[in-house]
């Protein structure tokens, strides 16, 4: 693997990702292409998500074997898996085989609590579910949201009737691990290697833009109208970790920017613009609220204001990418399919 084009910060993030997956031999494609620094980060994110998903399936297996009713380890591993997913969430650029797994990994937004209704029905069926059978069911019972319901919803039988819950929990967690393996496998090839420099540049800015807009949607839906928030539209409202998820989104986007775009802007003597974008990312991370739950923040006027303040910073970052970076590079950003409902 060649790290020549990586900035020091991005290099540290890549090395950290390598260590977190526990892999000594990277399966990332090794080529000499302008997209390579970004591709390396994307592959490592996919590899980390696979490793965490495998760990989550193993944690459920051990829990169901021991039935010790201690869900703390399960919850910790679920959160680590969710955090790993944040680096890939909201993507619309990359291998089609990876992108098509997004809804299977996470069903959100869930405007009508479909996950709650479907999971309540699933766990009350007296049968064992294999990963293959779960994969044929609704996406609402397949991924991270289904396992969050299992771990945090008061209607879940995981602690009150673990034997019953494990009939579906094992299949769901293994199905998630299977989907993560498909995603990691798809990222073993650089999807951008045939692009010329101009095409890649447009793709790169769009990649950042798509993920940013998805992150912003995770705030606009629950923020709704001033004075009329919709806290149940928050991602991970059951586990109350939505703000932690969003911070992980921002940190992943920051790493993608630093991997190459920051250097490209500086090479074109757009140093002042590069500094402003870099500072905006850093400011977002440094001022992120300590409160882990957007659901809880929206219960008070002060919390709502704090959440809105962070959203405005994301909006400023969007302006920098769309109106300044894209214009400076001659990139035209098209319609984002995640916009609207």
How should these model regions be labeled?
Residues 14-17:
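C-terminal motif of bacterial Sec signal peptides marking the signal peptidase cleavage site
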Residues 19-22:
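Bacterial signal peptide processing site
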Residues 1-7:
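Bacterial N-terminal signal peptides that target proteins for export
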